[in-house]
Regions:
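Short S/T/G/P-rich N-terminal loop/turn motif that feeds into the first structured element of a domain
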Residues: 1-123, 130-145, 151-178
């Protein structure tokens, strides 16, 4: 599965460009004014590319939380590795799968987490939750985890940007697979 992320006029979010309808869509409010962000999930890279989006992401991991199936109200969008270093992207994905995911999986209120990676090694993590406080608990939990013995702290430089925003609408596929 693949994804596109683009800025949108939230009043006109029904318009989709590309080859057919996306498998799923999440529309997020802007953190700093009018407008918003639309995340579309596509069955393949070709469908995603036909949207004309600046960047196409591959969905590399999906975590269904304890609140899976409930309507998400808040999203945390974490942008990692803006310089496109493949080693940093690999390290971030490894940390996510082997350290962070096990630590946060049991947190109440987490609906779903999507990990996206572009061909130029940018990583975006979209966490969907039923409340703002859930994202705060996730952050506290992540910061309390110790690095694994095989993690290199030099490659884990943190997020480039973190946006905590309201979810305006979310239509997630029932069986997202990476």
């Amino acid at each position: 599965m693949h994804a596109t992320i683009r800025a949108v006029d939230v009043a006109a979010t029904a318009a989709t460009t590309g080859d057919g309808d996306p498998l799923g869509t999440v529309v997020l409010a802007s953190s700093d004014g009018p407008g918003g962000t639309r995340l579309d999930l596509w069955p393949d890279a070709a469908s995603a590319a036909r949207t004309g989006a600046d960047r196409v992401y591959r969905v590399t991991d999906v975590m269904h939380g304890l609140a899976a199936g409930r309507r998400p109200l808040f999203a945390q969008v974490t942008w990692i590795n803006g310089d496109g270093d493949p080693a940093r992207a690999d390290a971030a994905e490894y940390a996510g799968r082997h350290r962070i995911r096990p630590a946060v999986h049991g947190i109440e209120g987490v609906v779903e987490v999507l990990v996206l990676r572009s061909d130029d090694h940018r990583v975006v993590v979209v966490g969907l939750a039923t409340g703002r406080e859930t994202h705060q608990e996730v952050q506290r939990t992540i910061m309390a985890t110790a690095l694994l013995p095989d993690e290199d702290p030099a490659l884990l430089t943190g997020a480039d940007r973190i946006d905590l925003v309201r979810v305006l609408s979310a239509e997630l596929p029932t069986a997202v697979r990476s």
